[in-house]
Swiss-Prot record:
Domain remarks in the Swiss-Prot or TrEMBL record: The cytochrome b5 heme-binding domain lacks the conserved iron-binding His residues at positions 155 and 179.
This protein's name: Membrane steroid-binding protein 2
Family: Belongs to the cytochrome b5 family. MAPR subfamily.
Gene name for this UniProt entry: MSBP2
Region of interest (Steroid-binding), ranges: 120-217
Membrane topology reported for the UniProt record: Single-pass type II membrane protein
Length: 265
């Protein structure tokens, strides 16, 4: 059987032949049963030694050198290989990602000032505590009771969802959950039981969460240039005059009757 080594150390020489010679060579290379192969049936190849054998030989030489070396030399060689591997891996490793810039901590909002008692003030005076002046506390009233809501400036301060209630007695608006300007008043007449219950819940929430700092002073409404107090006083004076007039009339009638009685025999 014809055999040939798989690899050769030197490249093979390719010879181009004429067509006729190629046909003769092909015909002579066809194997027929009962016909012996030319050249003894052996195909020779002048290939050199396989490169794999050289590698195996080098490994064997290194192994023999390691066996003959002293333990100190072996340990030193292993340590050197480890150092080389460490250095090589560090050089080939991808660079670390750039450090992210350190974010400066945001400035925290200063805590709200301590509640200050304002005492008894009018509704007009309460308007100046609607949050437009940051130096003043943020106040709001329910049923005439004033509370300091400065700690909830995000809700009741300028731009907040309930900023419309700040600086006012918003009892009716809270009871009806209304944002209409005509409901921003302390007048709770005509409210339903459900609305009064909602207002009571709001009052409980405010009294338990916020500090009460004052009350709203009741101002009598003027009508026709005279206040209600003047009207009451005038009514009292008129009443006293009527009583006095009635007494005088009764006295005159009594005196007339006495005179008539004295003329009779």
């Amino acid at each position: 059987m014809a055999t040939c080594s798989a690899a050769c150390a030197r490249p093979a020489v390719v010879v181009f032949a004429s067509p006729a010679a190629a046909r003769r060579r092909a015909a002579s290379s066809v194997y027929l049963p009962g016909r012996p192969l030319r050249g003894g049936g052996v195909v020779r190849c002048s290939a050199g030694p396989v490169s794999g054998g050289m590698i195996s030989k080098k490994v064997a030489e290194l192994w023999a050198a390691a066996r003959s070396a002293s333990p100190v030399a072996v340990i030193a060689a292993v340590a050197g290989a480890a150092v080389v591997y460490k250095v090589g891996s560090s050089l080939l490793a991808p660079p670390p990602p750039p450090a992210r810039p350190r974010e400066e901590p945001s400035e925290e909002a200063p805590p709200p000032p301590e509640p200050v008692q304002v005492g008894e003030i009018t509704a007009e005076e309460l308007l100046q505590y609607d949050g437009s002046d940051p130096e003043k506390p943020l106040l709001m009233a329910i049923k005439g009771q004033i509370y300091d809501v400065s700690q909830s400036r995000l809700f009741y301060g300028p731009g907040g969802p309930y900023a419309l209630f700040a600086g006012k007695d918003a009892s009716r608006a809270l009871a009806k959950m209304s944002f209409e300007p005509q409901d921003l008043t302390d007048d709770i007449s005509g409210l339903s039981l459900l609305e009064l219950s909602a207002l009571q819940d709001w009052e409980y929430k405010f009294s338990s969460k916020y500090v009460k700092v004052g009350t709203i002073k009741k101002v009598l409404v003027e009508q026709g240039g005279d206040s209600t107090a003047d009207a009451i006083e005038e009514a009292a004076v008129d009443g006293e005059d009527s009583i006095l007039t009635a007494k005088m009339s009764n006295q005159l009638l009594y005196e007339e009757e006495m005179e008539v009685g004295s003329d009779d025999p």
